[in-house]
Amino acid sequence: MSKAIYIEDNLFDKTIIDNERYTVRVIIKNKNNLFGYIYINGEDIFGYRDHIESAGGGIEEGETDEDAVKREVLEELGCTCKIVAFIGQIVHDFNLLRRRTYANYYYVEVIDENLETNLTSLEKTLFKGIIWKSLVDIKNILNKETSKVGMLVHKRELKAIELYEKYIKKNGGQNE
């Protein structure tokens, strides 16, 4: 496994990081070569949120990364997927939560979509839809200024896209 990418939280006041979370996240592409992201809009502990982020979440006890990827993609995007490759790990801090998150990123392709999602109550409050766009359009969105937490999330997502592009280049695939 290549070295993890570390992203420091330089937007919220520095604090002691005293808890960890292990997650999976995905770069997901559908049959139309569009990439799926969740549009987040609302308020929570971070304040106002207006950004996009990849599907993913915590790995449950007894679950493998692969199981968690398939569950999260179905729950959040309403898709079944094929895992193409593990593309890297991004470690990022959330000072407000006093948390360091270890996010294992996977490149996945949609098998079947438009299935029912199964969101948590918080997700139902914040998730405002799923967007499917070209990688160029996604990068343009991620490079726009947004709320503090949005900028932190977008920084992580741009690093994940770099991991995806590196994987595609190395493996001779097409990068849309």
Residue ranges and their predicted role:
Residues 25-27, 34-36, 105-106:
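Residues embedded in well-ordered beta-strands
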Residues 59-82, 92-146:
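Unchanged
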Residues 84-88:
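Conserved S-adenosyl-L-methionine
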